[in-house]
Amino acid sequence: MLFRSAQWRNEGRLRVETLTESGRWFKQNFPLTPATAVTAMLDQNDNPVGSIWYNSRFYRTNMMWTHNEFRFRDIHLFDQRIESDYLKKAGTSTQCIYMTMPLVDGYMWSSNSAWAGLRLVEIQSDGSSRQIKTGRPEIEEKGSELIIKCHPAEGEFTIRCTEQALYIAFDSDKQWALELTTATGKQLPFNQISIDAIKAEFNGHPYSIEAVRGNFVASDNGAYVLRIMPSDSAITIDCNLSR
């Protein structure tokens, strides 16, 4: 890898510089943290396990595909008003922990046998759900936005990540929702789930997640944590906590 880096440098494809120089360039070009995305649709063994990260200064989300099954593995909102533990004093341990405000946390809320996530489901006549297999995604970058489209048999599924919001649409004749499930026994931050907002508290910090389009429904039987129901076939989640 070092040989290849040197070769690319000599060819003008790679610039070698110090972190100070990189930081100065970044600050000059981006006064505010820009939106970024990272896509990896095959794992190291070329298995059809894919992951897409989208990050802005307001939130981050991770979308996972395991074969043809999709889930939001991670949706965390950022609040610049919350000071990190290391803002005014140095860290003295061997690890640093930076807290963000979760709507979905596939790492902390999962177990070896149950993967937490927000999944696309069809609502059955008895109120139960069936996960819809979305198939593999088509990915398009459009300015600061990321647009993801899937074509399951049940309709057209679209996710649009913008800097301040998540937009999800499913053009289908099925009754559908996004359904959050977690492993049993996990401590969740949600204090109150109402139609248009979730009141939550994490690490001593209260926050609210609002649905600009669609509504939240809490489970009444423990089969899931909550559902986000669409309005006119779409859901919009406001990811700006500073409003």
Regions found by a protein language model. Give the residues of each.
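Acidic, contiguous internal or C-terminal segments within carbohydrate-active enzymes
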Residues: S144-N191
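Beta-strand-rich recognition/accessory modules
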Residues: E201-R243
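Acidic-aromatic substrate-binding/catalytic surfaces of carbohydrate-active enzymes
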Residues: M63-E145, A153-E154
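Short aromatic-acidic-glycine turn motif
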Residues: S84, T184-E201
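Short, structured interface segments
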Residues: R13-A37
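Short, exposed beta-strand/loop patches in secreted or surface proteins that constitute
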Residues: D43-N45, I52, R130-G143, F157-C161, ...
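Surface beta-strand/loop "capping" patches
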Residues: Q28-W65
